Amino acid sequence: MSQPTRPTATLPDATAPALNRRDLLKQGTAVAATTFFASLGHSGVWAAGSDAPEKKEVKIGFIPLTDCASVVMASVLGIDQKYGVKIIPNKEASWAGVRDKLVNGELDFAHVLYGLIYGVHLGTSGPKKDMAVMMTLNNNGQGLTLSKKLADKGAGNLEGLVALMKKEPREYTFAQTFPTGTHAMWLYYWLASAGINPYKDARAIVVPPPQMVANMRVGNMDGFSVGEPWNHRAIIDGIGVSAATSQDVWKDHPEKVLGTTADFVKQYPNTARAVTAAILEASRWIDGGLQNKMKMADTIAGKAYVNTSVDAINERILGRYQNGMGKTWDDPNHMKF
């Protein structure tokens, strides 16, 4: 049987116009993925033989967020077994902890921020280490939340926030989840678009996603940028309002990825391929229909995973949004897996 033609990646010509940030991310990911999968050579995912996974059991770190779902469901549904591996989801407390455990080998893979992997690879968010992005886990589905106290003063959106900051000058505090992560990017870009310098006109702090709502409740911050379900949780609890969604800022943006180290991929290429295939199948299963999404929400809401109520998860994965101030809408650009 003839071997399938391997995909090739075409790099931009040196004389071509400069890439914008979106094109650069897309092309960089495409080149990395093409190089990896082409190097594996085999079109099948796993067969009992020389391409069997070298490591049968893998630990995958995750943060309690809706977009950890593909990792969790690949394990819960037994999809991983189809590919000859056993996925063990490991609940982590912070993105810094995920970074450290990936780098030192305590975790084999992680549900992780796109920008965290690049930060480690470039040495801008800790010790430099070559990293690998196996696949994008989701697009869209993050948000910018302002406190209900600000909203009650007319600052439930960016325009109102600018007006309030001028009317009542003080140190305004906003939280994001990791310095080189997408949530920092959403927050800084959003503030700067209205003339608010995120480094000079406000105070930015880092708070792990599951702790955002609790910190807003006690008044430690005026707003935050985080993934779901914590934006919706703040609305349900009556302490926050949705000022913007990440898809408002950048439609269909890449968000979390399945990340690992380059060393792991080199040492266990078949395992890397099998794990990626299992999680990709789980992602497709989630997006396969309403019943699947409801089962997913019910599963990840449990204490072992996100530890929140199902209603904090299931509305926004279906695109059913409310802003906490009486506005509701159906968003076709909700989280996609």
Predicted segments with their positions:
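N-terminal secretory signal peptides
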Residues: 1-23, 38
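N-terminal export signals
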Residues: 23-45
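Solvent-exposed alpha-helix faces
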Residues: 29-30, 107, 221, 280-284
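Soluble non-cytosolic domains of exported or imported proteins
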Residues: 65, 93-96, 181-182, 210, ...
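Secondary-structure end/capping motifs
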Residues: 267-337
